[in-house]
Amino acid sequence: MTYLASQKESVEKLRKKFLKTLGDNYIVGSNTEVSSFYGKSFMFDIVIFKNNEVVAGILVKNFCLSVRLICKPDQYINVFKDAGLRCGILYLGKDDEFYLWTDGNWSYQNVDFDGIVNSLKDNRPVGEPILIDDLAVEILSLLPDKLDDVECHHKIELLFKEGNVNMDKLNGYISFNSVAEDIFFKALLPQKRISKACRYTSLQSLFLLLKDKKHCMCSLTCMNDKGETSYADNYVGNGAYAENYQILEENNNCYILSCCADSKQDDLTMWRLYGCDAKGVCLRYKVNEKLVDNKSFFFAPVSYGSSEKEHLELEFINNILNWTKNGWRFKLNRWHIWKHFFKSYLFKDENEIRLLYVHNNDIEIEKCWIMDSKNSIASRLCLFDIDKDIFPLKVYSAIIGPNCNQQASNVAQFNYMNMQQKVIPFNRWNEAIVASKIRDYR
């Protein structure tokens, strides 16, 4: 048997052993790439996940490495650190030849398989339940100084009352109920009440909207920022992020519509950036707040970092997830939803308002696959019939871009088409779709 075949067999055997021992709460993948917060990627023979978070990365090496480890004990520690792992493991072929590294240390512990499992499960006894008032003090103390404004502090403080907080003594987790957790996340987002919004898109999108009488949302996988789906996970996951099937499933069942404030309608910069170089269309929406139910539809402005390495709201969330007292830890059960409302400061000029749809089996929605022409990624779409009153955004006007070919003809034709299809409300046939007022852009 070749060395590579033997190595592959050792990895798969160890992977299955961890999978069997750790149980259903863990996912154990092989040959998985882990991305650090700073954009570096590292390949590990085995990666262990819990709650979609990277718990540990494992490198499987031959037995001869143990001699080198004695001579150079920090071997591979920099790899674990640079990958942003909380736990790194070297396996040398025998059950008693595991070298365990944990974040904050500059050396390994030599442990057996059971010791590794106990360390990963972090089985700690849970003390007496924490009084809610004391819990409020603990959590609020984790607010970064720059973020500790009076309004945010007050909104979060009000959440700590009977009925809002659950304590799972069996697993040692404290959590909010879903309504309270939604309020918690909204308190960390920009505080704006939005009754109108607009979206820059292609002329083809307007055509399909009128032709098919359907609103279209794309899955998260087709976002223009390739780190879109992992940015927040990276930040609060201590820098280590890797995709597994469950994360892919979440991303393909979560759909997005990127909007901006209505004050940005017919804005030259927005036309250039998002309106197909001013050849596209700006759709204007009215928001039906009653349909933003925080069950299937979520609608809110996006929070942006203050610098490349600082995002205070995510820092607060990270502090909460790393908090512990008497064995108790805090769990955010709706993180998989609200994490998509946090983005890198590199995109702060967008001032994005985001509509998120999380697929709900109770609602019958048409879905299809496309090959995204811009990013060449296979992506899912979901389509909402305009005639069914379930979509929170209602188009009330459209503006054809200043650089659109045959602008006047397109305005007339789309208005006539809309009069036949009755998609955008109108008083006069030629008022629903108008030309941009910008006249000096080429």
Feature map (PLM): residue ranges:
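Short beta-strand-loop-alpha-helix junction that forms the active-site gateway
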Residues: 51-53, 59-70
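Partner-binding and oligomerization surfaces adjacent to conserved cores of proteins
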Residues: 131-442
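Short beta-strand or tight-loop elements
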Residues: 30, 42-44, 351
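Short, basic/polar, glycine-containing "phosphate-handling" surface segments that engage DNA
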Residues: 95-152
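Active-site beta-strand-loop-beta-strand hairpin of nuclease catalytic cores
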Residues: 40, 44-57
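Nucleic-acid nuclease catalytic cores
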Residues: 65-106
